[in-house]
Amino acid sequence: MKRDEFDHVLRAAAHALGQRDFLVIGTAALLGSYPEESLPERATRSREADLAPFDDPDGDKSMLLEGALDLGSQFEKTFTYYADGVDFRSGVAPYGWRNRLVKYRSPASEPGVGWCLEPYDLAATKICVGRAKDFEFVGALLDAGVIGKSNLMARISLMPKDRITPAQIDRAIRWLDGRQPR
């Protein structure tokens, strides 16, 4: 996703739900910390922004967002990118992630504001979940020097052990230890 697309999605989400603040948990969260020009192509090729509306105890707002801006919506058909309304109550991130959120706001996103996962929290979450595309994404960030191995290892150690299994953490660490720098 490009910055102008991210701005548009935040603006559209804010108008669709009548609220301004959204947690950004997917790859688009990087746009809160870095200009797209400084990111590897793999980090900006997604067409979606994963947005979790704040103050959504029952997940109803996430469902409304899904209908208005998700894959297959008129919004996506018109613009080719979209917002995936997510409910982060079941999500997982390293301890302390809420204190490290990166606020993203621009004149083009108004009235929408994105509270983006910090890049190391995002990367740790992705490689502990461990899908092939997540390893590819994190590998691209490491190869481009956007994130560093030692800081990522430290963040992996903060993953909640009651939500991520020891096997998932071990797999992430083995993958990170076995990577050959490019």
Where are these regions (language model features)?
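Compositionally biased terminal segments of proteins
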Residues: 1-182
